[in-house]
Structure formats: C-alpha cells, structure tokens
Curated annotation (Swiss-Prot):
Keyword Lipoprotein: no
Protein name: Indole-3-glycerol phosphate synthase
Pfam family, one: IGPS
Molecular function GO terms recorded: indole-3-glycerol-phosphate synthase activity; phosphoribosylanthranilate isomerase activity
GO biological process, one term: L-tryptophan biosynthetic process
Pathways per UniProt: Amino-acid biosynthesis; L-tryptophan biosynthesis; L-tryptophan from chorismate: step 4/5
Keywords: Amino-acid biosynthesis, Aromatic amino acid biosynthesis, Decarboxylase, Lyase, Tryptophan biosynthesis
PANTHER family associated with the record: INDOLE-3-GLYCEROL-PHOSPHATE SYNTHASE (PTHR22854:SF2), TRYPTOPHAN BIOSYNTHESIS PROTEIN (PTHR22854)
Organism per entry: Streptococcus pneumoniae serotype 4 (strain ATCC BAA-334 / TIGR4)
PROSITE patterns, per the entry: IGPS (PS00614)
C-alpha cells in the first residue's frame, strides 16, 4: 500500500466518519483476552485467520465465500482470533460481516479497518469485536495514543500495526501489548518476510508480536516462528481448497 494510496484510504475514512452517527455503547462481547492467551500458549505459532473478500493489491480474492462458515472453519481448526475486513470501498468488506461472525464464534474477533476516530471504535465494539487495529502509519503519535487509550478504556484490546523500526519504537513508547509487523512496504507496495525478521532483534520482553502479510506456506511460518507469537493470514486461507489443512500447516510447534 503506497503512502499515496494510504492517503486516499484515509481521506475516504474521514468522509465516512463525518457521516457516521455516534452509537450508544453496547455490552462488550465475552471471550478470552488475546494477550493472555498468547502469554499462556507460547509453545506454538498462533494463527490469526482473516476473512477478506478482496484487496486493493490483488483485486477479488473470494467474493462468494460463506463468511460465517469460513470463520467457523477457522475456529474449529485452532485459530486464535478471526480478523474481519470491514472496509467497504477498498476491500469489499462490511461491518455486518463482523457482526455476523462475532455472533457465531466464541473466539476473539478483530475489526480490521483504518480507524481514525472514536466513533469507529464504538461501532467495532458494538458489532462484536474485542480487538481493534490501529495503524501507526495512519495516525500522528498523539492521535494514536488518544485512540489506543479510548479503546482500552472500553475494554478492547488493540493490535498496533507497524512497518519499520521507527514505527515499532512508536508502538513501544505507546506501551502497546500486542504489536503487528506488516511485511508490506508502504512505499513500493511489495511484500517481504524479511521485514519481520529484520525487526525481531528490537522486540521487547512482555509484549506479543504478530507478523502480517505475505505468509502463505508452512515454510513461511517456520521462518517466523522463532521470533513471533503469531501470524495474521488472509489471502492464503481465503484461496485455500482445504482451509483446515492450510491452518494446520501454519501452526508451527515451537517445542
């Protein structure tokens, strides 16, 4: 995702937020805490499985998928959390997908979107998300902290996404407990697992790290397993003929 493209997305989000009603806060969906689970299950590389119909880089991925059935297959095969794309314009997602999936699974769900405003956080929680995504590249450090604090006050966990060392340092300063490293270069749009490997020496004790993007095979997962608590996988699972088998290949035992 180029910086120019990210700017386009954020402009669209600003327009959406302007039209968005402030919802009444509903009760938080009950499930386990992701950070607690990662802390207590470090013997395996955990899989966060994503429901994603399309993306700007790949176009349509799987438009006809039964999203609830896909999510339940993820859960049945040991996914630690389900990531749900809710951006409509660029990813062909919908908030209703998050609502439907969250009502049919027991594990945590992540609202995968470009969050820039508190109204979006309330909507995510009301739709059943227990975790939201905040992208360092999309926010000033001050705004990031405001949204992070707001989400945690609402009982939500936050996956703070980074792309390089400078952003990783921002996440550390923030006190983020769960940190994502996205292997997609925001300038060139290319993906490279080496991004995750290169940032690993800067990881800190007491935090949980998730590698995102460009993870397709068991070999990819094995490369990341020494450094990461989990991986976020979308396209490989949405395209897989045998979803259950693909998840098992990605769940690397660390011994």
């Amino acid at each position: 995702m180029s910086q120019e493209f990210l700017a386009r997305i954020l402009e669209q989000k600003a327009r959406e937020v302007e039209q968005m009603k402030l919802e009444q806060i509903q009760p938080l969906r009950q499930t386990y805490r992701l950070a607690e689970f990662l802390k207590n299950h470090q013997d395996r590389l955990q899989v966060i499985a994503e429901v994603k119909k399309a993306s700007p880089s790949l176009g349509d991925i799987n438009l006809d998928v039964d999203i609830v059935q896909q999510a339940q297959t993820y859960e049945e095969n040991g996914a630690v959390m389900i990531s749900v794309l809710t951006d409509e314009v660029f990813f062909k997602g919908h908030l209703d997908y998050l609502r439907e999936i969250s009502s049919q699974v027991e594990i945590p769900t992540l609202n995968k979107d470009f969050i820039i405003d508190e109204k979006q956080i309330i909507r995510a929680r009301n739709a059943g998300a227990t975790v939201i995504l905040l992208i360092v590249a999309a926010l000033s450090e001050e705004r990031l902290k405001e949204l992070y604090d707001y989400a945690t006050e609402l009982g939500l966990e936050v996956l703070v996404e980074t792309h390089n060392l400078a952003e990783l340092e921002v996440a550390h300063r923030l006190g983020a407990e769960i940190i994502g490293v996205n292997n997609r270069n925001l300038t060139t749009f290319e993906v490279d697992l080496q991004t995750s490997v290169d940032l690993a020496p800067y990881f800190e004790e007491g935090r949980y790290y998730i590698s995102e993007s460009a993870i397709f095979t068991g070999q990819d997962a094995e490369r990341l397993a020494p450094y990461f608590n989990g991986i976020l996988v979308g396209t490989a699972l949405m395209q897989a003929e045998n979803v259950a088998q693909r998840i098992k290949e990605l769940q690397i035992d660390k011994g």
